[in-house]
């Protein structure tokens, strides 16, 4: 019996590879964070369904969480999230609750008022 990956799993693995191979110095890497967050589109746009651990949205947040292992990377991720909040301002609350719904600790609070320069 031959096993095959679904297109969603293949895309997730490609995104995982993209973010894991990214460098902090490259501002274009925020696009990888945005791509991962795109799996949370319905929640960000409409406020439902709530993401739950094991969903594609929470899987994406887990990948992002693995990338917050230093102060420099947390500041970088914070700035990426602030950029997303600026673009999707009307949905800032949804974006700010993603890590909590998914049980992912990023080391900072996703909030429009967060000053990323003070993240440790």
Swiss-Prot record:
<dbReference type="InterPro" id="IPR016140">
    <property type="entry name" value="Bifunc_inhib/LTP/seed_store"/>
</dbReference>
<keyword id="KW-0732">Signal</keyword>
<dbReference type="InterPro" id="IPR036312">
    <property type="entry name" value="Bifun_inhib/LTP/seed_sf"/>
</dbReference>
<keyword id="KW-0813">Transport</keyword>
<feature type="disulfide bond">
    <location>
        <begin position="40"/>
        <end position="57"/>
    </location>
</feature>
<dbReference type="InterPro" id="IPR000528">
    <property type="entry name" value="Plant_nsLTP"/>
</dbReference>
<feature type="signal peptide">
    <location>
        <begin position="1"/>
        <end position="22"/>
    </location>
</feature>
<protein>
    <recommendedName>
        <fullName>Putative non-specific lipid-transfer protein 14</fullName>
    </recommendedName>
</protein>
<feature type="disulfide bond">
    <location>
        <begin position="58"/>
        <end position="102"/>
    </location>
</feature>
<dbReference type="Pfam" id="PF14368">
    <property type="entry name" value="LTP_2"/>
</dbReference>
<keyword id="KW-0446">Lipid-binding</keyword>
<feature type="disulfide bond">
    <location>
        <begin position="78"/>
        <end position="116"/>
    </location>
</feature>
<dbReference type="GO" id="GO:0006869">
    <property type="term" value="P:lipid transport"/>
</dbReference>
<comment type="similarity">
    <text>Belongs to the plant LTP family.</text>
</comment>
<feature type="disulfide bond">
    <location>
        <begin position="30"/>
        <end position="80"/>
    </location>
</feature>
<comment type="function">
    <text>Plant non-specific lipid-transfer proteins transfer phospholipids as well as galactolipids across membranes. May play a role in wax or cutin deposition in the cell walls of expanding epidermal cells and certain secretory tissues.</text>
</comment>
<keyword id="KW-1015">Disulfide bond</keyword>
<dbReference type="GO" id="GO:0008289">
    <property type="term" value="F:lipid binding"/>
</dbReference>
